[in-house]
């Protein structure tokens, strides 16, 4: 508003300007204090989230442990793949890395408690299967206090590099990739396959090829993790060769990178 419209004298304007400046300074200071408090709170929460109990390995110690040796880790459930006959397969992560837990001992009652963010302490044996480092079948766990959801990490630029495996099993993103043709059982070009060889049907795993910078990779929708009622399953079924897509999922490994995709967006 103009000064005339306000109907104030110069003295009133000066007083009002001083008051406004004081108020603005106080507001700015309060906002700065609040931001600092929020940051401190976040850092404290992250420190708590990353603090290990006595006898529990850090992620670095876990990765350095020999295959087939006993490991004890603490991590936070990010997703559940499946439960069957008191066995649960879990995607878990902490501040430093991720742990794939295959067929751990788990009652149906406990499985229901494992919502995303739940902290668990796992005791089992480290193993490797076709390049995938995991905690082997038969591990046990106990639920602990604490919660943490890992942020997504964009690893698009790491595709085709030796560094990518350092993010194995983490929740990651791939951006701007192109859908490439797969060949079905009759030799036709298709955007996806049911099972790796096209032998499956609706409800089975989906396999699809995507490329970046001239290199093609095979990604998967794991049907136990994301079944045929999920958005991602149906999004992949509707892909077209040549589509440009962004994706999120877990950086699984099988004879090379083979992510388990949980989200697809066509650009």
Predicted feature locations:
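Long, intrinsically disordered low-complexity tandem-repeat segments
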Residues: 21-38, 42
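C-terminal motif of bacterial Sec signal peptides marking the signal peptidase cleavage site
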Residues: 2-5
């Amino acid at each position: 508003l103009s000064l005339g419209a306000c109907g104030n004298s110069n003295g009133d304007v000066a007083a009002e300007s001083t008051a406004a400046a004081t108020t603005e300074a106080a507001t700015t200071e309060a906002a700065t204090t609040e931001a600092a408090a929020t940051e401190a709170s976040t850092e404290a929460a992250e420190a708590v989230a990353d603090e290990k109990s006595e006898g529990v390995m850090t992620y670095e110690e876990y990765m350095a442990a020999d295959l087939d040796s006993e490991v004890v880790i603490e991590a936070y459930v990010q997703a559940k793949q499946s439960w069957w006959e008191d066995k649960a397969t879990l995607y878990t992560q902490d501040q430093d890395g991720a742990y794939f837990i295959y067929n751990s001992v788990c009652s149906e009652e406990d499985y229901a408690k494992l919502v995303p963010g739940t902290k668990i302490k796992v005791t089992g044996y480290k193993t490797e299967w076709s390049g995938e480092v995991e905690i082997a079948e038969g591990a046990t766990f106990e639920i602990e206090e604490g919660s943490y959801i890992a942020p997504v990490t964009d690893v698009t630029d790491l595709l085709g590099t030796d560094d990518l495996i350092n993010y194995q099993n983490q929740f990651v993103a791939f951006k701007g990739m192109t859908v490439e043709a797969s060949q079905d059982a009759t030799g036709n070009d298709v955007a996806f396959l049911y099972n790796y060889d096209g032998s499956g049907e609706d409800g089975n795993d989906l396999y699809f090829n995507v490329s970046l910078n001239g290199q093609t990779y095979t990604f998967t929708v794991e049907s136990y993790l994301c079944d045929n009622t999920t958005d991602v399953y149906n999004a992949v079924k509707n892909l077209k060769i040549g589509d440009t897509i962004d994706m999120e999922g877990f950086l699984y490994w099988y004879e090379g990178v083979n992510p388990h995709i949980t989200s697809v967006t066509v650009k």
